């Protein structure tokens, strides 16, 4: 059970350690920090680099973490005026007698596991302890380089920029002990329906890491477009991408994986199949059944264009063999997982499949079992742990390898049903953690019956999932105590029918932070109660400001009237929050 925090309140401000640590205590002494602070890593002095073997992943992770810490403190910090009463003189004075951080000691208690750059869930101890003395000594202790990364991340959240110059913390002394509730804390990003430039993908990874989230689920292909280059099958992207400049090269994929590995974020690629695969038609039309049926596409697919890989085709099997033989070895050095998709398989589409000609589950289920068995065997041969969407297990009742991770999305019951069958589960109920909901329909409707039926044109998962709703979601809801170990964590999802690079940041941040805290800290407090919005809101407001300082166009949480009149416990000078009911 996670412990409560002991907050050191100062002025009307708040120390926004996000996500919430296991234990945290602070004081009200001021410490300044400058670029020349001495840093040691297990005794090896250097301000930014040079730790351990030059090419080791441990060295890369620690070096990058230190450089990122300095960049955050001195280039991407915030002046916290929004968190103090209006027109107040809240900034400390910098004088010749001001106390500075004198040293930062990073102590790793043991060697990193061999798979630190592509960890199997739970194999990396992500815990850390942080101590910052009022006399200026800072010590961060962790069993792994990732723990040190997270400790340094929390360290940056203790400091603010002064409008007069300099960087300070008003919180010394500080003591933190911390570790995650769940080992899988992810975001699913769809790059098929709208393309996301590499700069946006890097920014997503950076923001995930800053929130101590550790998985980027890359939904790389879908019905609408195939932007992923496969060198042995060049026409897939040459014909399946929206445009020649909207493709991901093998070098892009590797670079994204490497960037994630240095920040503790494992990139997990998904090729959705057999459904959601219509974009293959543009290069291999003979492999796709029920392609772009009009006008009644909705009889054959969840959204246009309809189409599915044929289910009983040797040509499809050959295609998948070649695809995986090309892709999997390139992914393997930097991930232990591969997502095979499997959601929203439409039985009616197979009435138009010349290798099946049926929508009967009695016919389709054994064919789908055979289809998935082949995919699973190829993943096993390549050394991957498979993921699938819940429909493969719960709707089609497929027999899956025991190490398969089942990604749920339809209900809390889906999580409970998955673990009841003995499988690992990822939570992510669309009624709580779908970030794209609430924008209204993206389909157009003909005048008359169609328009009247769908008026006022809400989308299927409206309303928008406010951060407070996301924060209330418990991944363990309905799961028996003796099966909670099978819930590895979860993901929040940004599908992209109406999300492109212009609004991507707004759609994801800071609401994904709420999911991140649930996954790191747990949905319940030490007393077993739902965590309070009142105490979370000031911290989330500050995290939003820190994301903006990092170049993320995150949506506002509250107006300054609210943030200027609250404290770390959500109250004001008279004990009552100003913006609460």
PLM regions and their residue ranges:
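Fungal secretory targeting signals
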Residues: 1-16
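Flexible, acidic glycine-rich loops studded with aromatic residues
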Residues: 386, 391-394, 398-404, 408-581
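Active-site neighborhood of glycoside hydrolase catalytic domains
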Residues: 298-301, 305-404, 409-419
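Loop/turn elements at helix/coil->beta-strand transitions in domains of secreted/extracellular proteins
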Residues: 211-216, 261-266, 333-336, 381-385, ...
């Amino acid at each position: 059970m996670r412990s409560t925090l002991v907050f050191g309140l100062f002025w009307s401000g708040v120390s926004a350690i996000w996500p919430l640590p296991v234990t945290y205590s602070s004081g009200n002494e001021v410490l300044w920090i400058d670029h020349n602070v001495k840093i040691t890593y297990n005794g090896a002095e250097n301000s930014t680099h040079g730790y351990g073997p030059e090419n080791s992943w441990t060295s890369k992770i620690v070096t990058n973490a230190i450089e990122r810490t300095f960049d955050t403190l001195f280039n991407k910090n915030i002046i916290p005026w929004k968190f103090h009463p209006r027109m107040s003189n809240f900034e400390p004075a910098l004088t010749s007698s001001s106390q500075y951080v004198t040293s930062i000691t990073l102590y790793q208690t043991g060697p990193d596991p061999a798979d630190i750059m592509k960890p199997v869930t739970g194999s990396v101890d992500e815990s850390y302890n942080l101590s910052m003395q009022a006399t200026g000594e800072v010590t961060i202790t962790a069993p792994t380089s990732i723990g040190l990364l997270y400790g340094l991340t929390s360290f940056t959240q203790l400091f603010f920029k002064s409008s007069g110059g300099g960087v300070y913390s008003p919180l010394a002394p500080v003591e933190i002990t911390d570790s995650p509730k769940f080992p899988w804390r992810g975001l699913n990003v769809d790059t098929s329906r709208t393309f996301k430039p590499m700069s946006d993908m890097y920014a997503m990874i950076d923001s995930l890491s800053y929130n101590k989230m550790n998985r980027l689920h890359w939904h790389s292909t879908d019905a609408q477009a195939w932007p992923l280059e496969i060198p042995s099958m060049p026409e897939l992207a040459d014909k399946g991408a929206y445009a020649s400049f909207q493709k991901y090269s093998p070098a892009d994929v590797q670079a994204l994986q490497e960037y994630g590995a240095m920040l503790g974020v494992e990139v997990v690629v998904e090729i959705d199949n057999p459904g959601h695969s219509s974009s293959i038609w543009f290069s291999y039309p003979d492999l796709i059944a029920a392609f772009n049926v009009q006008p009644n596409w909705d009889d054959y697919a969840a959204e246009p264009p309809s189409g599915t890989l044929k289910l009983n085709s040797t040509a499809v099997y050959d295609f998948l063999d070649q695809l995986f033989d090309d892709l999997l070895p390139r992914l393997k050095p930097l991930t232990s997982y591969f997502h095979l998709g499997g959601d929203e398989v439409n039985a009616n589409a197979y009435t138009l499949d010349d290798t099946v000609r049926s929508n009967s589950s009695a016919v389709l289920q054994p064919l789908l079992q055979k289809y998935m068995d082949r995919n699973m065997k190829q993943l096993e041969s390549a050394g991957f742990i498979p993921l699938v969407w819940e429909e493969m297990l719960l709707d089609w009742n497929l027999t899956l390898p025991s190490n398969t991770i089942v990604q749920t999305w339809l209900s809390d019951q889906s999580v409970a049903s998955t673990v009841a069958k003995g499988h690992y589960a990822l939570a992510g109920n669309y009624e709580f953690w779908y970030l794209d909901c609430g924008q209204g329909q993206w389909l157009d409707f003909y005048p008359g019956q169609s328009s009247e039926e769908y008026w006022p044109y809400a989308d299927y998962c409206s309303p928008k999932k406010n951060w407070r709703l996301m924060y209330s979601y418990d991944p363990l809801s309905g799961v028996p105590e003796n099966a909670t170990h099978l819930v590895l964590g979860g993901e929040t999802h940004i599908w992209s029918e109406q999300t492109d690079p212009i609004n991507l940041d707004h759609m994801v941040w800071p609401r994904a932070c709420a999911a991140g805290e649930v996954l790191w800290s747990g949905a319940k407090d030490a007393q077993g109660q739902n965590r309070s919005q009142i105490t979370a809101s000031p911290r989330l407001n500050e995290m939003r400001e820190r994301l903006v300082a990092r170049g993320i166009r995150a949506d506002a949480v509250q107006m300054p009237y609210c943030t200027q009149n609250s404290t770390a416990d959500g109250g004001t000078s008279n004990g009552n929050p100003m913006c609460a009911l």
